[in-house]
């Protein structure tokens, strides 16, 4: 796009909380947008409140009338839970562009078995998988098909009764199956090893636009040890508009007829595992992601135009900053994480030095001019640079400037699982 899709100052409302919402707000504001945020949960309000006006869902149960009143030009959801809100249809009927697919297209992420069936239909490699309604059915399936399985909720949502449990042996799988909530059943997916990677692109105007290849460090501790955390502890991002690793060609391009059939327009992420020289789909998502999104907005030269163009289902021209082709994300975790039932004290958070890259506050609050930890994930440090090595070094340089008693961060981002396909 040689000209902006919005000649005036575009008004953008983010739906979300925490560092992910704050990052989108600041990055888009820096590119000329007027930003605000609809806070969708009870926590993580501090970061967005520093970047623009906020509305709290408990005080404003339906944001659509205010969106119309304010003349909002674009809505950017951080999660798919907007699609189950009571005001979803009113938002869709309003005509306000949304950076998200809707209707059947949303099922690509929402319904894990729907994604599996799509892969089967279009010849895309997918691990052995099964939806079980209760423990007996799940147990019997594993006994009949003795492999380690990843246990997921069949329906993807932030409040799902089952959060992803990665089992690396048959015995681990059988043990965990005794301890999960079967209120929505379980989705069992063959464990494919640790050689995972992801790619995020945009679908717009009936075409797929490759964007970035990314790695998420999902386990809590160095050496990829400990449990899979509720959100990654770090990540790497590489601008990849030419599909350097073939993920778009193998795992997204075959879905192009379906994208067009469902009028899909929005972000799409595929997470895949490499086995025997072949990429297998693990899951699809329809948002920019908690680790990649904040870096992506900095890596693009024209993020406002890109976001508006995709939301309007137009052809787009993505332009990356050549000096920001690589990104690194680090999470500062607080007392008790990733064991979220452990509640820590009300500890102070101090920034000891001027940041030289983005620091986005997550579960913190302010009182009497001081900042305090209010949850388990304190901050996300996001860097972008001209090389991966420089991006990693910049992120580590800045996370050291944050102090909170008993907090921690991973020290080994980039030392494994990169480049894509590495152990």
Please annotate each region the language model reported.
Residues 180-185, 192-239, 248-281, 285-292:
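Phosphate-binding core of ATP-grasp and ATP-grasp-like enzymes
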Residues 99-164:
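A conserved helix-loop-beta module that forms one wall/lid of the active-site cleft
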Residues 53-63, 129-134, 165-168:
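Short acidic-hydrophobic, aromatic-tinged amphipathic segments that line or gate anion-handling sites
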